[in-house]
């Protein structure tokens, strides 16, 4: 079980931003910007290559809700995901980073 699965199961605490039945968003413990959030599906998906178009549409809507809640929609932000170890993916569970446009 990876660290994100342990967070989903409640075995590891996190600073939740938003949660619904399919997704969870929380603050990154090693922020790279003033605002650095993660968005993960509760379903076990290794990376972006494993997501279905339907789930991606739902995740996109959830990400928009998180951005609104963080108050960074108008100020600008970065949205990224790393796919595979060679691209820098450290946790083998699909996750998106939301980073405010300003540097930490």
Curated annotation (Swiss-Prot):
<protein>
    <recommendedName>
        <fullName>Uncharacterized HIT-like protein HP_0404</fullName>
    </recommendedName>
</protein>
<dbReference type="InterPro" id="IPR036265">
    <property type="entry name" value="HIT-like_sf"/>
</dbReference>
<dbReference type="GO" id="GO:0005737">
    <property type="term" value="C:cytoplasm"/>
</dbReference>
<dbReference type="GO" id="GO:0005829">
    <property type="term" value="C:cytosol"/>
</dbReference>
<dbReference type="GO" id="GO:0055130">
    <property type="term" value="P:D-alanine catabolic process"/>
</dbReference>
<dbReference type="InterPro" id="IPR019808">
    <property type="entry name" value="Histidine_triad_CS"/>
</dbReference>
<feature type="domain" description="HIT">
    <location>
        <begin position="3"/>
        <end position="104"/>
    </location>
</feature>
<feature type="short sequence motif" description="Histidine triad motif">
    <location>
        <begin position="93"/>
        <end position="97"/>
    </location>
</feature>
<dbReference type="InterPro" id="IPR001310">
    <property type="entry name" value="Histidine_triad_HIT"/>
</dbReference>
<dbReference type="InterPro" id="IPR011146">
    <property type="entry name" value="HIT-like"/>
</dbReference>
<dbReference type="GO" id="GO:0043530">
    <property type="term" value="F:adenosine 5'-monophosphoramidase activity"/>
</dbReference>
<dbReference type="Pfam" id="PF01230">
    <property type="entry name" value="HIT"/>
</dbReference>
